Amino acid sequence: MNLDTRKKFSLKKLKTAGRLIRQGRFNYVLIVAKRQIVAFYRRNAPYWLINLERRFAARSSRQEESFKPLLTPPFKVRSLTRNKPKIRAAVILDDFSLACWEHEFQVTLLTPNNWRSEIASNQFDLLFVESAWQGNNGAWSTRLSQPGQVDPVLHEIVTAFKEFDIPTAFWNKEDPPHFKQFIATAKMFDFVFTTDSNMIPEYEKYVGSGHALALPFAAQPIIHNPARNLPDTPGVPDPRWHQGDIAFAGSYFKNKFPERRFQLDILLKSAVTLANENFKFSIFSRTGFADPNNRFPSYAKPYVIGSLQYEYMLSANKEHKVFINVNTVTDSPTMCARRIFEVPACGTAVLTMPTPATKNFFSDSELVTATDSTTALSSLSILLKSPAMRDRVNHRAQRKIWSEHTYRHRALKVAKALGIPSDEYERQLAVPRVSVICSTNRPSQIPHLIEQVARQVNVEVQLIIATHGFELSQSHKLLLDRTFVDYKVVVTDTSMSLGDCLNACVNESLFDYVAKFDDDDIYLPHYLEDQINTLKFSGASMVGKQAAYAFVESRNALMLRRPEREHMWTNFVAGPTFVGPRATFVANPFQSRTTGEDTEFLRSVVNGGGHIYSGDRFNFIQMRHKNGHTWQLADDDFLAQGTVESFGFNEAHAEA
C-alpha cells in the first residue's frame, strides 16, 4: 500500500468514525480505536518490549486462574459449638442479624400471617425486633421503615405481647442516619437498644429514662471464627484460605456521607497502589452498578468484581489477608461497621480509619488504623508484607472479641435489661476454671512449673502435680502455699507409668476444664485464656497446638513447627498443649504406658467420635534441651518439621 493509498484509507476511517460519533456510537468508536492502537503497537514496538509484556500477562493470567474471588463457595459452619441458651424469642430480623442472633435465642420468625398462631402455640420470653429493611426473609419488606408510620400488624403484635406481660425490645442498628425512619416503630416497645450510644437521650424522650441502652454489633463465634477447614476433613486445609490480598465489601456514596467518602477514597487509592505492585485487590459492591450515585470512582472500577450474598461473604472473609474498612458514622463511641468484629474473628486483618468507636473497642495493638493517605499506604503494606505482624495484631483482636464482643455478651445485656433470667449466659461467660495437671520426676523443675502456671491471666487455676518417685521439699511446699489458693500434690511410685500418673491427676481435678502441662516448657500469660477461647468457639472435644514454637538448645534456634497446621481441625496436637473439658479426659483415660501415651489418648478421642482442633501458634514454646527428651528424634529431624525463625531464646517472638 503506497503512501497516497494509506492517506485515503486513514481519511476514510476518520470519516466513518465521525459518522458513528454523530450517531451516538461513541463507545464502539473507542473500542475500535483501542484495537487499532494495539495493532499499531504490535507492528512497531521492539521485540524485547513485546516479550516482556507477554511474560507479565502470562504471570497475571496464572494468578487470576489460581484465585477467582467471585467463585467463593457458600459458607459451611466450621464450629461444633452447640450451646444455644433456652431463652425463647419471637423475632423480626434481617438476614445478617438472624445469622448471629439465632445462636443466642430459641428463635421463632414472626410474619404478618403466622404471628397469631405462633403466640398461641409458644411460650415466649421476649419479642426482639430490629430496624429491619426486609425482615424474616422479606416478610416485612419496607413495612417497618416508613417515616412517621407504624405498621398496623406490628402494632397488634407488640400489643399482644404486652397483654401477656412478655417484655418487648427494639434494636435500631441504623442509628443515627435512619433514626427518623424507625422512631415511630421503636417507641412502641418497652426497651430500645441502639448501636449509637449518642442517641440514648433522644430515645429516652419516648421510652423513659433507663429504657434506652447501647447495643453495638459483635461477632458470632459459631460463624465468625478462624477455622481453616471443616471438622469432618481433619488435616485437609481450605485451598482458598488467604489466597486474596486486599478486599473491600460495601458501598460507595457519591452524594452523601462526605467524611466516609473522603476516608474510603484514601483507603481505596492505597489499595490500588499496591494492586499495581501485583497484590490482588477485590471490591465487593453491595449496591451493584445500577445507581450512578453508588458507582465506584474510575480509579477503582477495574477492581469492582460484583457482589456476594452474606452466606458467600462469610466465606470471602477467610479468603483475603486484609479488609479495608470505613464507618458511615464517624463520631459515635459505639457505632461502627459489623466487619470490625466479624472479619478479625474470621482470621483476617482489618485496616480502618479511626473513629471514637474503633478506639473504644480496640487498642492500637489490636486494630490497625490509618489517619491519612501516607499512613494508609504504609499500614496496608505492612499488613500484606509482614505476616508475623499481621497475625499478632489479629490474634490480639480476636482475644478482645472473645472476651467482650460476642453476641453472647450482647444477649446477656438484653436479658438483664428485660429482667429475663440470665444465669445461662453468665455461666458461659464467667471466668473459666482450669485444672492444670502435670506429672514430673524432676524436683528441680517444680519452681519453673509453678512460675508458668502462676502467670496465667483471666482464668482461675487449680494446679495438680504428680511427683513421680519423690516428695516435695519444704521450700517447694511454701512456694505453692504462697502462690496458689487451690493445689494438690499426688505422690506416685516409680513403678507407675506416666499415663497412670496423669490419670491420678485427672481424678483429683475439680474444675470444668483440664490442661496438661510439661514441667520444662514455656507457657506465656495468655496461653490458657487463648486455649479456652479456642475450645469455646470450635466446640472441639480437645484443643492444642500442632503449629507451635520450639527452642532447640543445641542449635540455639527458635523454630516454628508445622506452621501450615494453625487453626486446623486435625487428629494430632502436641502433648504439652492438651486442653479440653474434664469429661473428655475422664472418658478417655491415658493408657498405662510411659511413651506414646499422648498419641494413644488422641486416638481414643477420635475413635470415640470426638474432634480435635489445632489452635494458634502463640504463647507457648516447647523446649528441646541438649540433655535429651523422651522423644526419640534427632535434632536435625526435629528442625526439618518447621522453619527456624530466630536465634537465641526469645519469649517475645512467641508472645501475642
Model-predicted regions and their roles:
Residues 12-156, 162-167, 173-179, 183, ...:
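N-terminal pre-catalytic "stem/leader" segment of glycosyltransferase-like enzymes
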Residues 511-522:
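Short beta-strand-to-loop acidic/aromatic patch adjacent to the donor-nucleotide binding site
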Residues 451-460, 481-483:
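Short, acidic, metal-binding catalytic loop of nucleotide-sugar glycosyltransferases
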